[in-house]
């Protein structure tokens, strides 16, 4: 499938003009705060960097006072953010323009449909495809919610820039508005003073649904159906995009996730979508003024009108309005029910009648006036037992369908399009909650809980000491033969066990009241054996979520390390062979999900080893499923950076092994990229469209690489990857000075103290690299600009292969030209190297206290230079990013500013370690961390 890359069409002239305007406004705001001399100092730093005089730049920064640092840190943090906004606006403009003139671009859904429609099984593909972005709260989203809101204001103003240029909008007013928001941004705290709580993370992510995701997903789903009809393909209920969420349910290493946060995550979702429905229904109420004197209505709609709490004489002859009033009153009752949160009492809504003006969780403000106006009517109707709440979203959908059918039957079909059709589509996609919530916990916690249960029930005293075979035998017996619940004994339970059981009980409650889809899977971190999966089954059995025939929550193994990925084939062979598992899967539509960990496998073995091991594991696991008639679906735990599986989403999906995407794919969207991808409705639509198009493309496009050649390619990769893994581990785990280098020559200590998420930086006290979470590990290498997880070990391994035999370079060049996986792998390394900077990294190395520790940098530098030479040789390129001119131009805009910020950060770290910063001034380091992450556009 051939597409023009959208990013190559960006209007650099417009972006350059906008950046000039934004820089001028930021200069003015800085001048007002720091004075002319303060702004001159900042401009001098940029001049020194442009001249390449890094020693003079370092000296100038060292002479700055801490007060000078305040304004410089803010300036160099905010300018890259403003550049980002301009680029995002231009991207949205290009998407809309190309859609309107029917021009192709990468990931355009209509062109993907052209290819899919030619397949013999086009209908099955389109009916069943399901892409699930899963929003996580990993601690890499460093911007405050307030800053995100200011960003959106500036985004909306820049969207009007072309109209300003065309004279359609008053230039002076537009400029004044833009100036005001830049001024506010310059005077707003960039970072959080306190660490986020899980509750804050939940409410923050809800804002993305309010501002963009509900609209974008609804629009995309509607477009998907429209294109199918256009191709003459009749679909029943396609769900090309549904959302997932970890926030509130992911307790792996986060002690602050509890049964209450799980419940809050579910109920807040319901309140957000219900508020959306109530507003939409109110719009329909206002517009559907059809008179019964002039049009007919169905009996069903007439009955709804009779039940309406709107008894005004002025609406006696307006049955549709009264029907919508009836629907809205039921929605309000449903909202009140969820706000009460007491799912065991169906009259919970009525108890809120004394406090009618309720807070709207989606906005933090009161329920809108139109809701308030009808709340009292609705509650009065409840007291008269004439209006109930909707027990299911299906019941709400049925009422809307009744109105739709009435319109169709009475020649009023033209009224269905617009708001009504949009509402109907939203209900079909979301129901009464926005996203499926995943639960996740580490396998060691499950084992400890099961061991405690078995001991308290006098079954096994020393479960953890049993062999794997013995463990599986004990667990299977309990699952298949023992109907009792082990936790029913009177023996006191540990706090950990109590918390785990409470979460599982809440999960069952939510599924019982909100539906099966609200919580569908539980992920087991560090899955290393079959017993790890059966241990979770035992805990789910305790609350009635698992029995001998059915698992209401699917057990999803997460294979993370290189060793676990290599063993995943044998583990799943054994697991899928048990009769009880076969029955569970049969009752789950023959799907078994497996999660793949990109972050930890990279930290464990390096970029090449991680990428290749993941590739092979997918092939092997898919084959196991096919042998057993099971659809293996993969959940890709990818981060924002290449070091954590990131990179361009379209290329990442289309380079997956052919056949490994059956129809469903899930992938994490990590903290720092959520704002970039889904911060506004245009960006959200484009990124979701790309995910769906890429998935469809990979499902229908056969392997373009010659099968015989592919065998040779795999043998070459096996050899190179083994070498790369050894080189990487020799440095990271074998060099005696590496640990000290990482902790002294990067801002890892400062990153760990940054208030960017609710979760600790490590599961326990860090004594070695293996104890550190993958996210702060990658985040810190991004900050010191080495980007080590995205490339180290690549250059030497390829170079050894090239030098081993004449013609090997040509083989690698051929692989790059003909094998999508290999091309994507190397293109990501190219991108990472383009964002790295060894001059800056050298100055970070000087933060290390001893010469022995500083010498680690020389090893890294040699490998960086070798990797650069080898990658460019294989690509046949002269420089980085030759195939991504827009990204190259983008870096050209921003590098001078956030590179200076690195030098400022280095000086601040020096002062901090010499105890020359006050507590307030320490926050400046956090501001620089924020600015560098913003400039890179992906950080952890």
Swiss-Prot record:
GO cellular component, one term: cytosol
Family annotation (Pfam families): PEPcase
Cofactor: Mg(2+)
Keyword Acyltransferase among UniProt keywords: no
Domain of life: Bacteria
Residue ranges crossing the lipid bilayer per the database entry: none
GO molecular function: magnesium ion binding; phosphoenolpyruvate carboxylase activity
Entries under SUPFAM superfamilies matching the protein: Phosphoenolpyruvate/pyruvate domain
Gene3D superfamilies attached to this UniProt entry: Phosphoenolpyruvate/pyruvate domain
Keyword Lyase: yes
Annotated PANTHER family: PHOSPHOENOLPYRUVATE CARBOXYLASE (PTHR30523:SF6)
NCBIfam families given in the database record: PRK00009.1
Family, as annotated: Belongs to the PEPCase type 1 family.
Name the UniProt record assigns to this protein: Phosphoenolpyruvate carboxylase
Organism for this UniProt entry: Streptococcus thermophilus (strain CNRZ 1066)
């Amino acid at each position: 499938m051939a597409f023009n890359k959208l990013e190559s069409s960006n209007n650099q002239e417009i972006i350059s003009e906008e950046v000039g305007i934004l820089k001028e406004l930021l200069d003015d705001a800085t001048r007002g705060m720091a004075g002319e001399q303060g702004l001159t100092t900042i401009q001098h730093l940029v001049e020194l960097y442009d001249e390449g005089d890094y020693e003079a730049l370092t000296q100038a920064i060292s002479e700055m006072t801490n007060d000078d640092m305040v304004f410089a840190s803010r300036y160099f943090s905010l300018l890259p953010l403003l550049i980002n906004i301009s680029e995002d606006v231009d991207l949205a403009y290009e998407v809309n323009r190309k859609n309107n003139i029917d021009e192709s671009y990468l990931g355009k859904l209509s062109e993907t449909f052209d290819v899919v429609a030619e397949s013999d099984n086009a209908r099955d593909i389109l009916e069943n495809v399901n892409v699930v972005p899963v929003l996580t709260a990993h601690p890499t989203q460093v911007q405050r919610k307030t800053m995100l809101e200011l960003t959106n204001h500036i985004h909306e103003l820049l969207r009007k820039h072309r109209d300003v240029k065309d004279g359609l909008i008053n230039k002076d007013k537009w400029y004044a508005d833009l100036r005001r928001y830049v001024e506010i941004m310059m005077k707003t705290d960039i970072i959080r003073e306190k660490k986020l709580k899980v509750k804050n993370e939940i409410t923050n992510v809800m804002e993305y649904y309010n501002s963009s995701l509900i609209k974008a997903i609804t629009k995309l789903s509607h477009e998907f159906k429209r294109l199918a009809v256009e191709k003459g393909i009749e679909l029943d209920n396609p769900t090309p995009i549904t959302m997932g969420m970890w926030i509130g349910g992911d307790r792996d290493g986060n002690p602050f996730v509890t049964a209450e946060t799980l419940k809050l995550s579910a109920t807040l979702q319901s309140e957000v979508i219900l508020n959306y429905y109530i507003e939409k229904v109110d719009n329909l109420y206002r517009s559907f003024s059809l008179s019964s004197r002039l049009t007919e209505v169905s009996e069903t709609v007439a009955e709804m009108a009779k039940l309406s709490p709107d008894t005004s004489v002025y609406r006696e002859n307006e049955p549709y309005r009264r029907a919508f009033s009836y629907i809205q009153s039921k929605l309000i009752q449903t909202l009140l029910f969820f706000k009460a949160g007491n799912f065991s009492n169906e009259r919970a809504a009525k108890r809120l009648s004394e406090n009618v003006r309720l807070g709207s969780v989606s906005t933090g403000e009161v329920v809108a006036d139109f809701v308030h106006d009808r709340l009292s009517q609705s509650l009065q109707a409840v007291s008269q037992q004439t209006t109930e709440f909707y027990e299911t979203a299906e019941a709400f959908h049925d009422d809307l369908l009744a109105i739709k059918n009435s319109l169709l039957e009475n020649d009023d079909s033209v009224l269905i399009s617009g708001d009504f059709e949009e509402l109907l589509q939203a209900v079909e996609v979301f129901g009464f909650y926005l996203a499926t919530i995943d639960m996740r916990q580490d396998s060691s916690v499950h084992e400890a809980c099961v061991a405690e249960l078995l001991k308290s029930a006098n079954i096994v005293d020393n479960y953890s000491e049993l062999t794997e075979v013995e463990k599986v035998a004990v667990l299977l017996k309990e699952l298949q033969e023992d109907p009792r619940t082990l936790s029913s004994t009177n023996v006191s339970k540990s706090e950990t066990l109590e918390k785990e059981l409470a979460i599982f009980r809440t999960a069952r409650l939510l599924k019982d009241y909100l539906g099966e889809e609200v919580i569908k899977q539980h992920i087991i971190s560090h899955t290393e054996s079959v017993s790890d999966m059966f241990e979770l089954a035992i805990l789910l059995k305790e609350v009635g979520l698992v029995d001998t025939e059915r698992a209401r929550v699917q057990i999803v193994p997460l294979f993370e390390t290189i060793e676990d990925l290599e063993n995943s084939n044998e583990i799943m062979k054994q697991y899928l062979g048990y009769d009880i598992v076969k029955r569970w899967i049969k009752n789950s539509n023959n799907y078994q999900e497996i999660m793949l960990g990109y972050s930890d496998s990279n930290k464990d073995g390096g970029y090449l080893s991680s990428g290749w091991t993941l590739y092979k594991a997918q092939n092997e696991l898919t084959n196991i499923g096919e042998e057993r008639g099971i659809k293996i679906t993969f959940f890709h735990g990818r981060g924002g950076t290449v070091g954590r599986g990131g990179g361009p989403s379209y290329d990442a999906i289309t380079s997956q092994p052919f056949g490994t995407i059956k129809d469903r794919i899930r992938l994490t969207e990590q903290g720092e990229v959520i704002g970039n991808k889904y911060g506004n409705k245009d960006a959200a639509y484009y990124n979701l469209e790309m995910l769906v198009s890429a998935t469809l493309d990979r499902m229908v496009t056969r392997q373009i690489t010659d099968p015989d050649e592919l065998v040779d390619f795999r043998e070459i990769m096996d050899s190179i990857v083994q070498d790369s893994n050894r080189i990487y581990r020799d440095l990271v785990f074998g060099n005696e000075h590496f640990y000290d280098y990482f902790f002294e020559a990067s801002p890892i200590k400062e990153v760990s103290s940054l208030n960017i998420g609710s979760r600790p930086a490590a599961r326990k006290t860090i004594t070695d690299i293996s104890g550190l979470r993958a996210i702060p590990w990658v985040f810190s290498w991004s900050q010191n600009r080495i980007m080590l997880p995205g490339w180290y070990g690549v250059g030497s391994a390829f170079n050894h292969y090239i030098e081993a035999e004449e013609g090997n370079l040509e083989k690698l060049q051929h692989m790059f030209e003909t094998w999508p996986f290999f091309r994507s792998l190397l293109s990501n390394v190219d991108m990472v190297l383009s964002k790295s900077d060894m001059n800056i990294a050298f100055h970070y190395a000087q933060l290390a206290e001893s010469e022995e520790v500083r010498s680690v940098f020389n090893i890294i530098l040699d490998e960086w230079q070798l990797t650069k030479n080898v990658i460019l040789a294989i690509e046949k390129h002269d420089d980085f990013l030759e195939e991504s001119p827009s990204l190259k131009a983008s870096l050209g805009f921003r590098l001078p500013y956030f590179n200076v910020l690195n030098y400022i950060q280095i000086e601040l770290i020096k002062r901090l370690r010499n105890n020359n910063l006050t507590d307030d001034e320490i926050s400046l380091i956090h501001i620089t961390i924020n600015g560098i992450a913003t400039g890179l556009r992906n950080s952890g």
